[in-house]
A protein has these predicted regions:
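Conserved, mostly hydrophobic/aromatic
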Residues: 18, 48, 99, 131
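Glycine-rich, proline-tolerant flexible connector loops at the mouths of alpha/beta enzymes
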Residues: 19-27, 47-68
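Short, well-ordered coil/turn segments that N-cap beta-strands
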Residues: 10-14, 42-46, 82-86, 102-104, ...
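Catalytic alpha/beta core domains of metabolic enzymes, predominantly
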Residues: 126, 130-174
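Catalytic beta/alpha-barrel core
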Residues: 67, 84-92, 104-115, 128-139, ...
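Alpha-helix-loop-beta-strand connector modules within alpha/beta enzyme cores
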Residues: 64-85, 122, 126
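Conserved small/polar residues in nucleotide/adenosyl-binding loops
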Residues: 48, 174-176
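N-terminal amphipathic alpha-helix/helix-capping segment at the start of soluble metabolic enzymes
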Residues: 1-15
């Protein structure tokens, strides 16, 4: 199991990237292979990201995934094939334990970053918990989300900046 310490060994920089949602094994393996070649060449630690299910679609008939267990097994295969950690989003407390059986990092989507039950369930798996900052929050307010995970017994917390929304759909990001 990877730890926050493992990721910190990379001088505080690593790449977390992959498809928005797992659409199939071949696609996921092809993406991982390509990114692993690049990150190996550049000596950048890599974490493969892919949602096993996208619960936050605009339309009811939008594609949400290939099935939970099938997609989670694809993520596990990516990890084993390329020896990289994997991360996936979870959207409810009930998903935490199931997803934790297959992945190294549980990611909390930005719009769910204040959901106490979800944060506590993710924390209780013992996995790293990556909380994406809600665009409606100040960076300082994310401390409360992180504190919930730590207070639930898990100090392996990452925070991901997602920008801040001003007005209606006017998203500002920090450019690095």
């Amino acid at each position: 199991m990877i730890t926050i310490s493992d990721l910190k060994k990379s001088d505080n920089f690593f790449l977390l990237a992959g498809p928005c949602v797992i659409e199939g094994e071949e696609m996921a393996l092809r993406i991982a292979e390509h990114v692993v070649k690049l990150t190996d060449k550049l000596n950048i630690p890599y974490v493969f990201k892919g949602s096993y299910r996208k619960a936050n679609r605009s339309r009811l008939d939008s594609f949400t995934g290939i099935g939970d267990e099938k997609a989670l097994k694809v993520l596990q295969k990516v990890s084993r094939t390329f020896d990289v950690p994997v991360v996936t989003d979870i959207h409810s407390a009930e998903e935490a334990a199931m997803a934790a059986e297959y992945v190294d990092v549980l990611q909390i989507p930005a719009f769910l970053c204040r959901q106490t039950d979800l944060l506590v369930a993710a924390a209780q798996t013992g996995k790293i918990v990556n909380i994406k900052k809600g665009q409606f929050l100040s960076p300082g307010a994310m401390r409360f989300a992180a504190d919930k995970v730590v207070e639930a017994g898990n100090d392996q917390v990452m925070l991901t900046e997602r920008g801040t929304t001003f007005g209606y759909q006017d998203l500002s990001l920090i450019h690095i």
